[in-house]
């Protein structure tokens, strides 16, 4: 699941500029969030899974949805169209660093030596990926800020749900979060729309449909399933390879930079991932 999620999300980033050639970031995200939410809730219903959420948990569900899904999706989308998509992915995936800080502050999760080393390797990988894009960030500071905001929003939503878990199946929780987060984004899409209503091109429809069904619906379902099973800081580090895949796919699909810094970053991120998911064997007695 983790390997598939890494490739689904990593290869998703170069598609953002294609999706937003004709649509605003607000319209694109409103469509993909609402479509992904409706798809998951429909599948849950067809499988006979109750869609209800206990009344006491609706507030937290809404707050987490806005922090992660609304802030992350809008900010990352804006960042991806103002700076190279691979560089945007790197900024968004500073998320594990923010999760480590927030989970220590609010969840009391202690970072073991392996986690600290993985975090250091992950930070080194992110730094190596950031360096080639410094000029792009200087030319588009709002894109840089939006990328960092995306990572913070994702981290905040993850920690909230770890502290206040929603007692429903992951497919139901994910579906409602996608649908709830689409509402404020949809309102802004309508309010900020300028110009005549038009029918998007076939390419735009295909790209947005794919993003809605696979990275948005399936990807988020898998992410919430993983996040529910792992400590917050480990869950965050588990997706550290996504920006590396985004860089490689951006280079292949859009001719974005790929050189020694990216290769070194890949080695750092692979080391961080190995430390995170591979547990040492217990010492044998005697």
Give the location of each predicted region.
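Helix-helix packing/entry segments at the starts of transmembrane helices
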Residues: 29-31, 69, 73, 88-94, ...
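Juxtamembrane helix-entry segments on the extracytoplasmic side of multipass membrane proteins
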Residues: 21-30, 53-59, 116, 131-156, ...
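Hydrophobic transmembrane alpha-helices of multi-pass small-molecule transport proteins
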Residues: 35, 40, 62, 94, ...
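Glycine-/small-residue-enriched transmembrane alpha-helix faces in small-molecule transporters
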Residues: 1-32, 36, 78, 136-163, ...
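Cytoplasmic-side transmembrane-helix entry/capping segments in multi-pass membrane proteins
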Residues: 56-64, 111-123, 143-144, 168-178
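Hydrophobic/aromatic residues within transmembrane alpha-helices
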Residues: 19, 28, 32, 79, ...
């Amino acid at each position: 699941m983790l390997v598939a999620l890494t490739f689904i999300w990593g290869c998703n980033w170069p598609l953002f500029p294609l999706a937003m050639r004709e649509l605003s970031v607000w319209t694109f995200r409103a469509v993909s969030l609402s479509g992904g939410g409706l798809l998951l809730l429909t599948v849950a219903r067809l499988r006979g899974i109750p869609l209800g959420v206990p009344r006491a948990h609706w507030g937290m569900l809404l707050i987490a949805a806005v922090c992660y899904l609304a802030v992350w999706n809008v900010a990352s989308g804006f960042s991806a169209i103002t700076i190279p998509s691979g560089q945007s992915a790197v900024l968004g995936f500073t998320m594990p660093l923010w999760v480590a800080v927030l989970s220590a502050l609010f969840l009391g999760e202690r970072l073991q030596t392996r986690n600290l080393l993985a975090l250091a390797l992950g930070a080194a990988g992110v730094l190596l990926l950031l360096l080639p894009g410094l000029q792009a960030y200087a030319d588009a500071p709002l894109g840089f800020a939006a990328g960092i905001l995306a990572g913070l929003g994702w981290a905040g939503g993850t920690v909230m749900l770890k502290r206040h878990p929603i007692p429903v199946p992951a497919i139901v929780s994910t579906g409602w979060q996608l649908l709830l987060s689409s509402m404020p984004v949809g309102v802004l899409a309508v309010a900020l729309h300028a110009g005549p209503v038009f029918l998007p091109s076939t390419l735009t429809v295909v790209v947005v449909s794919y993003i809605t069904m696979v990275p948005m619906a399936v990807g988020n379902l898998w992410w919430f399933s993983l996040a529910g099973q792992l400590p917050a800081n480990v869950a965050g580090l588990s997706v550290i390879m996504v920006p590396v895949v985004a860089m490689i796919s951006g280079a292949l699909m859009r001719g974005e930079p790929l050189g020694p810094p990216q290769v070194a970053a890949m080695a750092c991120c692979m080391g961080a991932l190995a430390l995170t998911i591979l547990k040492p064997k217990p010492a044998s007695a005697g």
